[in-house]
Amino acid sequence: CDDLSHRVQSIGSVNTIVRLGDGSLYGDNTDYYGFSKMIEALGLEVKGKYVLILGSGGASLTVKAYMEDMGAGTIVTISRRGQDNYDNLDKHHEKANIIVNTTPLGMYPHVDKAPLDLAGFKRLEAVLDLIYNPEETKLISQAKSLGIRTINGMTMLEEQARLASFIFKQKI
């Protein structure tokens, strides 16, 4: 891209690219806005909370930036190979308040998969799964059975698409 929005510059992840009238490319990130609407729809307060982000791709960067901006107390990214990984997840069982799944685990057609088992988490208030197909992943289903608030990724998808459409119309 020839020009990047301030969001992209701070997050480091682009998901919307528009070719401008002069032929240059403009990059933006609409997932931040979409994720904010997901939090809003759930009525979730993140300030001071202990947040686990599952996955280390572009979506996780966006979620981390949002959580930092909203004042989350501790933000831990869980990846397959990092310092915080699925093999030592139990060290977060007593602390985590919010889990955000940014991995594809549980997405159609692998609906029998989940990135983790929620049973050990004692202070969990909410599970946000960016997956929207199926509407209720195995992770969401388990959270509901434990009485934990949940939301899938459909709100994020719809809201980021609205913003992307607006950006396309404004920039072209």
Question: What annotation goes with each model-predicted range?
Answer:
Residues 37, 41, 65, 69, ...:
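Short, well-ordered alpha-helices that flank and scaffold nucleotide-derived cofactor binding pockets
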Residues 85-151, 155:
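Rossmann-like adenosine-cofactor binding region
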Residues 44-50, 122-123:
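Short helix-loop-beta connector
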Residues 1-41, 146:
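Phosphate/diphosphate ligand-binding glycine-rich loop within oxidoreductases
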Residues 69-87:
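NAD(P)-binding Rossmann-fold cofactor-contacting core
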Residues 37, 149-171:
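Active-site capping/gating segments
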Residues 29-32, 39, 48-68, 72:
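Glycine-rich adenosine-cofactor-binding loop
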Residues 57, 81, 133:
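Residues in the short beta-alpha loop(s) of Rossmann-like NAD(P)-binding domains
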